[in-house]
Structure formats: C-alpha cells, structure tokens
Amino acid sequence: MQRFVSKFVSTPPVPKKFQEIFPKKRTVNKILFQLDTRLTYHEMYPIFLQVSQNTNEENIPWRKKYPYIRSSDIMQMRNVLITLRTQNKFVHKDLLAMEDKLLNIAAELGNNDAISILSFNVIHEYKKENVKSSYEKDIETANEFIKKLYARNHHLTVKLIGDLFFENKTYDKAEKYYQEFLKLENSTKLAGEVHGKLGEIQIKQVNGFLKAEKSWLSCIELLEIERSSRWYFLLARLYMSSEPMKAKALLENCASIGFKECFKTLGFLELNYFNNYERAKEWFKTGMEIMDLECFFGFFDCCVKEENFKGARDCLESVKKLGNDKDKKTMINVFLESRKDSIKLLDKARL
C-alpha cells in the first residue's frame, strides 16, 4: 500500500531546467528494466525532482515524505544516472551533482554501500596534498566505518579495499582482496569489474596468460560492453598473434561503442594479417577523424600497398603538418625514418 502513496504526494511545478537536463521517460524506463529496479518511473520521478531542488543545507524527512522508499532504492536511482552517463559518454554537471546528493541521502538512511563509498571518497580526497590537514578527523571516521564494514564482510567494502591497493599499484594486496570478494559474490556486475581488474594483475605475472584470459572472459560475460570495453580490448590484444579472428570480433565490439584505442588496432590487424586494405583504410579513416596519429601512418601504408600514390602523398602531407605539434614530432620523425623507402617510391612515381 505504501508504495502507492507517491500518487498522492503533491509535487512542485517542474522547473524548465530540470526538464531540459533530465532524460526522457522512455530512456529512464529502459534503464530501470536493465537494472531490474524495485520502484517504477512514476515512483522515482518526484524524488529525482526533489533531489534536484534540494540544497545540502536542507534537512528533508525523506521517509516521512516518501514512505515507500528504501535506502537501496535511492542507490538504484543513483545507478540510473550512472548508467545514463556511461551509455551516453556525457557528463552533465547538474546530473553529476544529483548522483552525489543521492549518495548522501542513501548514507543518511543507513545504506552500507553508500557509507562505504563516501568513506573511500574521503580517503581519496585525503591523498591530495592541499587537504591533508583539514581531513584528519574525517579520515579517522572513514577508517572506522571501513573497519566495521569489513568486519561484517560487507561485499562492496572488500572490493573497494582491493581497488585502493590496485590504484596504488600494490597488486599483491589488491589480488588478495579481489579473490576474497569473489568468494562472497561471483556472478554480479560488481564481480565483472573485479574479474577485469584481476586480469590486469594476472597478465603481469609469470605464466599469467591463461589466468588473465579466464578473468577477462568472466568479466565480459557479466558486464555490458559500455562498462567492459577496456577489458574487451585487453583480451583482444591477448589474442592478436594466436587467434586473430577472436581478436577482430572483440575489437569490433569495442569499435561499436566508439572505443578510441581499437580503431588503429583493427586497422593494422586488417592490413598486416588479413591483407584487407580497403577495410583497414576504413578503420584508419575513423581514427584519423579523431586525430589518432598512428591511423595516419596506417592509412599511408595501405595507400602504398595499393599503389595509390596520390592518396599516400596526401596522407604524408597531412602527417608533416601535424609535425608542428611538439608532442607528436618524435613519433612523426620515427615514422618518416622508417618509411624512407616508401617515400622514395612516391618520388619515383612522380617522374
């Protein structure tokens, strides 16, 4: 019964700014279906609206005003915004502020995931030199929360401890906590992220190829491509020399969501392994549009292979113009030196 109280809660007029930034109902419903949320769009919408208008100073009795909500619902609402941001690859500052507000509200309502995330946020802030002195009391409180949550085998806390060690490149400790997490849960999206990072640790180890492959395969099975494109790409690189067809399929998945690194890799794979110059040129052209220098190099090589000397000359001129950029100059000089024979061939073709 309480879940339907939302229908009778009077909602304030919807500000124009909120209408402009908040996603359409159809988009939100699609994400709610993906996340399998407990609340519907109509139950969430007035809360989203209230949160957008709420200032940090306001103390709103959320459970009294919206009796149907749980702290886990607030976290799911935050996940809706995170999913939207991930899929769109666009960050709107007001929606990002709403994510933070929702996290704080969930923590106020006693959600352990929210408390854990906020505690680790404090630790990350503490690492910045300019805030160390002012964060001593906060860091002490955050550490207390983390210790208590870890003692209760709180899943997210175990994972975030692993993440902290991973970021600090203390890989042996990161692996320990990641393995500990996977004993607690092994088939969730969070587990997918852990498998992905675990693979990055394992590939650095002696004879870690098979372990990394297994971890990344588990990762891409559990996570949608938008959240796992990095690990699709790393797995593809693992297969480049031994199983190029597998590598190609994985890279094409990455390309479908605009993962920048894969354009040149796909281009060189088509050029050097499959000898498909036209297809290689298509990938290189896509990379050239985002000014990936190596895609210019690859396109030049394709034109030379096809004896398309005009195309090769035009590409070479474009590369030389990019040489004015100091960051690119060294790479361009190496390219020009390594392609001396091809460049001589272009000069002969003019005669």
Swiss-Prot record:
Signal peptide start and end residues: none
Localization annotation: Mitochondrion inner membrane
Placement of TPR repeats on the sequence: 155-188, 260-294
Annotated Gene Ontology cellular component terms: mitochondrial inner membrane; mitochondrial matrix
Primary location group: mitochondrion
Tagged with keyword Ribosomal protein: no
SUPFAM superfamilies assigned: TPR-like (SSF48452)
Coiled coil ranges: none
Record has Cell inner membrane as a keyword: no
Keywords: Membrane, Mitochondrion, Mitochondrion inner membrane, Repeat, TPR repeat, Transit peptide
Gene Ontology BP term (one): protein insertion into mitochondrial inner membrane from matrix
Protein task: Required to stabilize mitochondrial cytochrome C oxidase subunit 2 (COX2) and to translocate the C-terminal domain of COX2 through the inner membrane.
Extra remark: Present with 736 molecules/cell in log phase SD medium.
Quaternary structure and interacting proteins, as annotated: Interacts with COX18.
Entry protein name: Protein MSS2, mitochondrial
Organism encoding this protein: Saccharomyces cerevisiae (strain ATCC 204508 / S288c)
